[in-house]
Protein backbone atom coordinates (compact mmCIF):
# COMPACT_ATOMS: atom_id res chain seq x y z
CA UNK A 1 0.00 0.00 0.00
CA UNK A 2 1.14 3.53 -0.70
CA UNK A 3 -0.35 6.88 0.22
CA UNK A 4 0.71 10.48 -0.38
CA UNK A 5 -0.32 13.27 1.97
CA UNK A 6 -0.13 16.52 0.01
CA UNK A 7 -1.06 20.08 0.81
CA UNK A 8 -2.72 22.94 -1.00
CA UNK A 9 0.37 24.92 0.03
CA UNK A 10 2.92 25.29 2.79
CA UNK A 11 1.91 25.64 6.45
CA UNK A 12 -1.40 23.77 6.13
CA UNK A 13 -0.44 21.08 8.64
CA UNK A 14 1.08 18.43 6.36
CA UNK A 15 3.85 17.41 8.75
CA UNK A 16 1.57 17.25 11.78
CA UNK A 17 -1.09 15.23 9.97
CA UNK A 18 1.39 12.99 8.14
CA UNK A 19 3.29 12.20 11.34
CA UNK A 20 0.04 11.48 13.18
CA UNK A 21 -1.18 9.15 10.44
CA UNK A 22 2.19 7.40 10.31
CA UNK A 23 2.09 6.88 14.08
CA UNK A 24 -1.51 5.62 14.02
CA UNK A 25 -0.82 3.09 11.24
CA UNK A 26 2.41 2.03 12.97
CA UNK A 27 0.35 0.59 15.81
CA UNK A 28 -0.88 -2.19 13.51
CA UNK A 29 1.46 -2.16 10.50
CA UNK A 30 5.12 -1.69 9.59
CA UNK A 31 5.17 1.78 8.03
CA UNK A 32 8.03 3.08 5.91
CA UNK A 33 7.93 6.89 5.89
CA UNK A 34 9.04 9.06 2.96
CA UNK A 35 9.32 12.80 2.30
CA UNK A 36 9.16 14.50 -1.08
CA UNK A 37 12.13 16.75 -1.76
CA UNK A 38 15.43 17.34 -0.01
CA UNK A 39 13.93 18.09 3.43
CA UNK A 40 15.87 16.65 6.37
CA UNK A 41 13.91 18.14 9.27
CA UNK A 42 10.40 16.70 8.76
CA UNK A 43 11.77 13.17 8.23
CA UNK A 44 13.11 13.17 11.80
CA UNK A 45 9.50 13.33 13.03
CA UNK A 46 8.53 10.48 10.70
CA UNK A 47 11.40 8.36 12.02
CA UNK A 48 10.36 8.98 15.63
CA UNK A 49 6.73 8.10 14.82
CA UNK A 50 7.44 4.87 12.94
CA UNK A 51 10.78 3.59 14.17
CA UNK A 52 12.02 3.47 10.55
CA UNK A 53 14.36 5.98 8.93
CA UNK A 54 12.41 8.27 6.63
CA UNK A 55 13.67 8.41 3.05
CA UNK A 56 13.55 11.24 0.53
CA UNK A 57 11.96 10.99 -2.92
CA UNK A 58 12.94 13.93 -5.12
CA UNK A 59 11.93 14.26 -8.78
CA UNK A 60 14.52 17.00 -9.26
CA UNK A 61 17.34 14.53 -8.67
CA UNK A 62 15.57 11.28 -9.55
CA UNK A 63 13.87 9.97 -12.68
CA UNK A 64 10.51 8.20 -12.40
CA UNK A 65 12.18 4.75 -12.46
CA UNK A 66 14.62 5.88 -9.76
CA UNK A 67 11.73 7.15 -7.60
CA UNK A 68 9.96 3.79 -7.95
CA UNK A 69 13.19 1.93 -7.17
CA UNK A 70 13.95 4.07 -4.09
CA UNK A 71 10.39 3.63 -2.84
CA UNK A 72 10.48 -0.16 -3.26
CA UNK A 73 13.96 -0.39 -1.74
CA UNK A 74 12.72 1.53 1.32
CA UNK A 75 9.79 -0.86 1.72
CA UNK A 76 12.05 -3.89 1.31
CA UNK A 77 14.73 -2.75 3.75
CA UNK A 78 12.24 -2.05 6.53
CA UNK A 79 10.02 -5.01 5.58
CA UNK A 80 7.16 -2.51 5.56
CA UNK A 81 3.50 -3.21 4.92
CA UNK A 82 2.98 0.29 3.56
CA UNK A 83 4.74 3.46 2.52
CA UNK A 84 3.36 6.82 3.61
CA UNK A 85 4.76 9.85 1.82
CA UNK A 86 4.58 13.43 3.04
CA UNK A 87 4.53 15.93 0.20
CA UNK A 88 6.35 19.24 -0.11
CA UNK A 89 4.77 22.71 -0.38
CA UNK A 90 1.60 22.64 -2.50
CA UNK A 91 0.77 19.55 -4.54
CA UNK A 92 1.79 21.21 -7.81
CA UNK A 93 4.60 23.50 -6.57
CA UNK A 94 8.06 22.52 -7.79
CA UNK A 95 11.15 24.30 -9.04
CA UNK A 96 9.27 25.82 -11.98
CA UNK A 97 5.88 27.56 -11.92
CA UNK A 98 4.87 25.69 -15.08
CA UNK A 99 6.62 22.30 -14.84
CA UNK A 100 6.24 19.26 -12.62
CA UNK A 101 9.89 18.75 -11.65
CA UNK A 102 10.37 18.65 -7.90
CA UNK A 103 6.70 18.65 -6.95
CA UNK A 104 4.59 16.16 -5.03
CA UNK A 105 2.32 15.49 -8.01
CA UNK A 106 5.28 14.13 -10.00
CA UNK A 107 6.10 11.65 -7.22
CA UNK A 108 2.43 10.60 -6.99
CA UNK A 109 2.42 10.00 -10.74
CA UNK A 110 5.68 8.03 -10.65
CA UNK A 111 4.34 5.77 -7.89
CA UNK A 112 0.73 5.67 -9.10
CA UNK A 113 -0.16 6.58 -5.53
CA UNK A 114 -3.43 7.98 -4.23
CA UNK A 115 -3.24 11.49 -2.79
CA UNK A 116 -4.94 12.80 0.34
CA UNK A 117 -5.19 16.59 0.03
CA UNK A 118 -4.64 18.62 3.19
CA UNK A 119 -5.92 22.18 3.34
CA UNK A 120 -6.34 24.83 5.98
CA UNK A 121 -10.13 25.07 6.15
CA UNK A 122 -10.23 27.80 8.77
CA UNK A 123 -13.13 30.16 8.01
CA UNK A 124 -14.13 28.09 4.97
CA UNK A 125 -17.27 26.14 4.18
CA UNK A 126 -18.24 25.91 0.51
CA UNK A 127 -14.94 27.46 -0.52
CA UNK A 128 -13.10 24.41 0.86
CA UNK A 129 -15.07 22.22 -1.56
CA UNK A 130 -14.23 24.56 -4.44
CA UNK A 131 -10.53 24.36 -3.61
CA UNK A 132 -10.60 20.55 -3.51
CA UNK A 133 -12.57 20.35 -6.77
CA UNK A 134 -10.08 22.70 -8.41
CA UNK A 135 -7.15 20.53 -7.34
CA UNK A 136 -8.93 17.42 -8.59
CA UNK A 137 -9.47 18.88 -12.05
CA UNK A 138 -6.10 20.57 -12.54
Over which residues does each language-model region extend?
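ATP-dependent carboxylate-amine ligase catalytic core
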Residues: 2-12, 16, 22-111, 115, ...
Amino acid sequence: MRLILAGTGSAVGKTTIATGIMKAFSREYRVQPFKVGPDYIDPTYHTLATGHSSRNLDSFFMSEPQIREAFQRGLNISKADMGIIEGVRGLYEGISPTGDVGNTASVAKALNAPVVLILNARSLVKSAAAIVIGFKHL
